[in-house]
Amino acid sequence: METQGVMKEIQYEEFEEKIIEIRRTSKVTKGGKNLSFRVVAIVGNKNGKVGLGIGKAREVPEAIRKAISAAKRNIIEVPVINGTIPHEIIGRQDASKVLLRPAAPGTGIIAGGTVRAVVELAGIQNILTKSLGSTNPLNLALATMNGLKNLLDPRKVAKLRDISVEEVFKGVRREDNA
């Protein structure tokens, strides 16, 4: 069992980490205010894997450690084709919406701070994004992750439709003679 734990740690070493937000929160009690911190962190290998985590603790370093640990447990696979996403999609989380559009090579990452961090760590180099609604960093990050998670892999779509990957991108339809 120990070797599995070691393998998982080695697997995580390749991930880059970014802190999206550190928020101080307070709980008002009869004895006064209890301060704590909430940290939102993103981890990714810049090669199609990205994760988001939230950590809460009385001290900032402990909250950061918890957030990064949670992000490593919540990693998703993102289909990246030629440095961009395969199709347009809208990610939603509460009052936040994020429009993600594929872009031509050389466009770069057109995105705000929170969305940019998620997209960069996913390994996407060319993308157009637009944040709509609430700009709360946590909800924007969750909406972006939702959009990336719901992207369809062209290879899987081609297999389901029994056509080639090129035909998926061209939008060619086969006429059935049945």
Swiss-Prot record:
<comment type="similarity">
    <text>Belongs to the universal ribosomal protein uS5 family.</text>
</comment>
<dbReference type="InterPro" id="IPR005324">
    <property type="entry name" value="Ribosomal_uS5_C"/>
</dbReference>
<dbReference type="Pfam" id="PF00333">
    <property type="entry name" value="Ribosomal_S5"/>
</dbReference>
<dbReference type="GO" id="GO:0006412">
    <property type="term" value="P:translation"/>
</dbReference>
<dbReference type="GO" id="GO:0019843">
    <property type="term" value="F:rRNA binding"/>
</dbReference>
<dbReference type="Pfam" id="PF03719">
    <property type="entry name" value="Ribosomal_S5_C"/>
</dbReference>
<keyword id="KW-0694">RNA-binding</keyword>
<dbReference type="InterPro" id="IPR018192">
    <property type="entry name" value="Ribosomal_uS5_N_CS"/>
</dbReference>
<dbReference type="InterPro" id="IPR005712">
    <property type="entry name" value="Ribosomal_uS5_bac-type"/>
</dbReference>
<dbReference type="GO" id="GO:0015935">
    <property type="term" value="C:small ribosomal subunit"/>
</dbReference>
<dbReference type="InterPro" id="IPR020568">
    <property type="entry name" value="Ribosomal_Su5_D2-typ_SF"/>
</dbReference>
<comment type="function">
    <text>Located at the back of the 30S subunit body where it stabilizes the conformation of the head with respect to the body.</text>
</comment>
<dbReference type="InterPro" id="IPR014721">
    <property type="entry name" value="Ribsml_uS5_D2-typ_fold_subgr"/>
</dbReference>
<keyword id="KW-0699">rRNA-binding</keyword>
<protein>
    <recommendedName>
        <fullName>Small ribosomal subunit protein uS5</fullName>
    </recommendedName>
</protein>
<comment type="subunit">
    <text>Part of the 30S ribosomal subunit. Contacts proteins S4 and S8.</text>
</comment>
<dbReference type="GO" id="GO:0003735">
    <property type="term" value="F:structural constituent of ribosome"/>
</dbReference>
<comment type="function">
    <text>With S4 and S12 plays an important role in translational accuracy.</text>
</comment>
<feature type="domain" description="S5 DRBM">
    <location>
        <begin position="15"/>
        <end position="78"/>
    </location>
</feature>
<dbReference type="InterPro" id="IPR013810">
    <property type="entry name" value="Ribosomal_uS5_N"/>
</dbReference>
<keyword id="KW-0687">Ribonucleoprotein</keyword>
<keyword id="KW-0689">Ribosomal protein</keyword>
<dbReference type="InterPro" id="IPR000851">
    <property type="entry name" value="Ribosomal_uS5"/>
</dbReference>
